[in-house]
Structures are given as structure tokens and as C-alpha cells.
């Protein structure tokens, strides 16, 4: 039989367990309530963040605008661009238009600007004519107005010459069978000079005409430094006659002195093979003509390119001022014997340049000279072979600046010249023939108009 004390202990234990059970149930309910509350809080936070992101996204993209172009549209982002004024170059001024030009113009970034009210802003403006993409940065202030100025796209003469041309190379030697005398319009030939790749005309092209400083010129080649070499053709596009030479074809001796080897030099020094202290009479004539007719255009004439009067000797010849036997210069060996002309100048003392050039003898006062016999040969004037169908033919006699020989028997110095029927020949320096100056236009010269034909020459 259970005692009172034992019964009391049993009741106490039962009550304790019941109490513990109620505590556990209450704790579990509390945990469930806390979990539900936390889930609600998380959902609220996620909702708020999503709303913020959505708001900023809408704010960002609702400012996208478009500018109408000639073809298509370009998109850009901005805060509030009220106006874009578009101006295109029209001669010496600008004309306002209602659309960005489709081609033929480039953005003048220095002249273009944006402003807020009356205050100009420090912005960077770029425009890609190919992709039709306009960029304005920064663009963050409402009421911004931008003004875009477009300049007519300039075409470099060198680019215009090479545009749509077929580039060819020619194999040496240049024999009679390789003489170029046919129409070569649309063709230009590649070789090497002292500056790199050079592109020259040969045969009878009709697309190598330039009008510069009031005169017509024929392009000889694009030099390796990018300048453009040209020979004088006169005040008209007539290709024959005395008007294709300066001073209306007045004849000029290369040098009035003739009885020493050094007199073959465009410049010379008594007793020296490569001296350059004295001007030849023909150089005096060329310089005088330049000073009277081209000096005011000197900013468009190259100070880098030069003119080669090669005084190196041919194989088997040794230089002497008054040799006892005939001596020959290297150009005679190249053009008469081997038919292998070159546009490189093997001795820097014979490359006539002005002081501003990086190459040559820097002896010239004016950046003007004469054509070389090698250039005549590469154009089509093969030694001793008549050619009246190439662009250097003018039915006249005129000098080159390339030495030929010193004849010990006659006691005369000889220089190459172009014969009246178009081929290369030689004559004593004291004889008088025509003069056709050669200049090099600067590599960055642009054209106003023209396609290189005689009726529409490249206008500088």
C-alpha cells in the first residue's frame, strides 16, 4: 500500500512532467511565430530592393533619345538634351542644317561644344562617320545644348593619286621589249627609293596632271617619304613645244665651263668628285625661276625630299679632274650598258637637299632641281630608243641632272639629256638645251578638286 509521502512524490513528478510539456509546446509555438515573422521581414526587404532597382533602371533608360540622320538613327544617352545645332563647312564659313551629314565630312571636335544656359561645358564630343555613332561625355545636366561643326573631309594628294590605281612592279633590265609606251591610265608602278616604297608613273597616263601655283605639272612619282614629285609642263596642258619648258623654252647651258670632270655637277667644287660649293649655271637659272614663281608657295613644297645627281663612277673608271683616258659615271653604266635604272642615290653628297632634310648634302637654298636620267628611263625613255608615246615626251631637248662621262679625247664633260624624239642621250655641258624644273609637294598637301586628267587636274 502506497504511503502518503510516496503518493505525494508521484503527484509532484506528474505535475513536473506536465509543466515541462507545456513549456516545450509554448517554446515550439514561439519558434514557429518567430520563423513566420522573419520570413515576412525578408520578403519585405527583397521587395524594397527590387523596387529600388526597378526605379533606377527605368530612370536610366527613360532618357534614351535618337537623332535622325540621312540614313538610319544613332542612339545616345543624355539627361535632357534640348537642342543639337548641326553646322557644315561651306567655303570659309559654316551653314546650319537639320541633319548630320552622311559622308564627306568629319566632326571638328575643337570647334564643336556644349553649353548649359550661356556657359560652355567641358565636354568631349566624338562622331564616327562609318558607324554613325555620336558620343557626348559627360552628359548629366538638364538643359544641355550642343552645337556640332562638320568640316569638309580633306583628301591628300598622295591618297588621291593611289586611289583606284592598279599597282604593278617591273622586272629589270628595262630593254626595248619592256619599254612602256602604251596608255597606262589607272596604273602606277612600285619601286624603292632612299625613303622607302615609291610609286611612279610610266608610259602614257592621262591621270597624272596637277595644277599648282598657276602652272601645270606632270606627276613623276610619290616619293618614299610621301611627298609628290612633279615636272614642269607650263601654263597650259599642251604636251609638246617650247611652252612645256621655263622661260618659253629658252635654251640654257648646263655649265659654261666644260673641260674638267667636276663640271658635270649640279653643284661642284674644283678638284673634287663630290664637291658642292659652287652652283652650276643651270642651277642658277632654276633657282631664279623658283624665287620668282614658287617662293610664295614654299609651305606646300617638301623640305625633305631631294634630287640625285649621281657622280659615282662606273665599274672600271677612276675619277680624275682631267683624266688622260675617258671615264664614265655610274648612270651611264646603269642606263646605257645594263638597262637597270634606280631611284636610290648611292652617295649622300650627290643627293641635293635643303638644310631641313634628314638626308642628303643639305646644300640647296631652294627645294627645286631637275629630273634624273633614271626617272626618265623608268617613265619610258629607254636609252637610244625613240618613244613619242610617254608623258615626258615634249618634242624638245631638255636637260637631266645625271652625269654621263668625261671624254678625254675631246676634253668635254657630258650630261644626260632627253632628245627631241623622247629617248635618253648625252651632250657636252656647254651646249644649251631646255629646262624643266622638278619640285616635290609636301606629303600633307590636300587637293581642292580634280581627278588628275588634263581637263580636271588635281588642284592644290
Residues covered by each model-derived region:
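Long, domain-scale functional regions
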Residues: 41-42, 52, 80-460
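Short, polar/proline-rich extracytoplasmic segments that appear immediately after membrane translocation
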Residues: 31, 35-86, 451
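Intrinsically disordered, low-complexity peptide-like regions
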Residues: 6-8, 15, 36, 348, ...
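N-terminal Lys/Arg-rich, disordered targeting/topogenic segments
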Residues: 2-34
Amino acid at each position: 500500500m502506497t504511503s502518503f509521502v510516496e503518493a505525494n512524490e508521484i503527484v509532484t513528478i506528474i505535475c513536473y512532467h506536465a509543466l515541462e510539456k507545456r513549456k516545450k509546446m509554448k517554446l515550439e509555438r514561439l519558434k514557429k511565430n518567430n520563423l513566420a515573422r522573419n520570413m515576412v521581414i525578408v520578403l519585405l526587404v527583397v521587395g524594397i530592393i527590387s523596387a529600388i532597382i526597378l526605379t533606377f533602371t527605368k530612370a536610366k533608360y527613360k532618357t534614351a533619345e535618337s537623332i535622325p540622320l540621312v540614313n538610319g538613327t544613332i542612339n545616345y544617352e543624355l539627361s535632357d538634351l534640348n537642342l543639337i545645332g548641326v553646322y557644315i563647312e561651306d567655303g570659309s564659313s559654316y551653314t546650319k542644317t537639320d541633319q548630320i551629314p552622311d559622308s564627306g565630312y568629319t566632326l571638328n571636335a575643337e570647334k564643336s561644344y556644349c553649353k548649359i544656359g550661356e556657359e560652355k561645358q567641358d565636354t568631349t564630343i566624338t562622331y564616327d562617320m562609318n558607324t554613325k555613332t555620336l558620343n557626348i561625355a559627360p552628359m548629366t545636366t538638364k538643359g544641355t545644348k550642343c552645337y556640332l561643326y562638320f568640316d569638309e573631309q580633306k583628301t591628300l594628294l598622295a591618297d588621291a593619286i593611289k586611289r583606284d590605281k592598279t599597282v604593278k612592279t617591273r622586272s629589270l633590265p628595262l630593254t626595248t621589249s619592256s619599254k612602256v609606251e602604251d596608255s597606262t591610265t589607272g596604273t602606277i608602278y612600285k619601286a624603292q627609293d632612299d625613303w622607302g616604297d615609291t610609286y611612279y608613273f610610266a608610259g602614257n597616263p592621262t591621270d597624272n596632271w596637277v595644277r599648282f601655283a598657276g602652272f601645270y605639272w606632270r606627276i613623276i612619282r610619290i616619293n618614299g617619304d610621301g611627298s609628290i614629285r612633279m615636272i614642269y609642263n607650263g601654263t597650259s596642258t599642251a604636251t609638246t613645244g617650247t611652252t612645256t619648258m621655263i622661260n618659253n623654252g629658252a635654251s640654257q647651258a648646263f655649265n659654261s665651263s666644260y673641260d674638267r670632270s667636276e663640271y658635270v655637277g649640279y653643284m661642284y667644287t674644283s678638284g673634287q668628285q663630290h664637291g658642292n660649293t659652287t652652283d652650276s649655271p643651270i642651277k642658277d637659272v632654276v633657282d631664279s625661276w623658283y624665287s620668282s614663281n614658287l617662293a610664295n608657295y614654299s609651305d606646300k613644297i617638301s623640305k625633305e625630299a631631294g634630287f640625285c645627281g649621281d657622280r659615282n663612277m662606273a665599274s672600271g673608271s677612276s675619277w680624275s679632274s682631267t683624266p688622260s683616258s675617258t671615264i664614265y659615271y655610274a648612270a651611264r653604266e646603269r642606263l646605257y650598258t645594263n638597262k637597270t635604272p634606280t631611284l636610290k642615290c648611292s652617295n649622300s653628297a650627290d643627293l641635293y637637299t635643303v638644310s631641313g632634310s634628314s638626308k642628303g648634302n643639305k646644300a640647296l637654298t631652294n627645294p627645286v632641281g631637275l629630273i634624273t636620267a633614271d626617272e626618265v628611263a623608268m617613265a619610258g625613255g629607254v636609252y637610244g630608243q625613240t618613244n613619242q608615246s610617254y608623258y615626258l615626251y615634249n618634242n624638245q631637248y631638255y636637260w637631266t641632272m645625271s652625269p654621263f662621262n668625261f671624254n678625254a679625247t675631246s676634253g668635254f664633260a657630258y650630261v644626260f639629256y632627253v632628245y627631241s624624239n623622247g629617248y635618253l642621250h648625252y651632250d657636252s655641258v656647254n651646249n644649251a638645251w631646255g629646262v624643266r624644273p622638278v619640285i616635290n609637294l609636301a606629303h600633307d598637301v590636300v587637293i581642292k578638286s580634280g581627278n588628275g586628267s588634263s581637263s580636271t587636274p588635281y588642284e592644290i
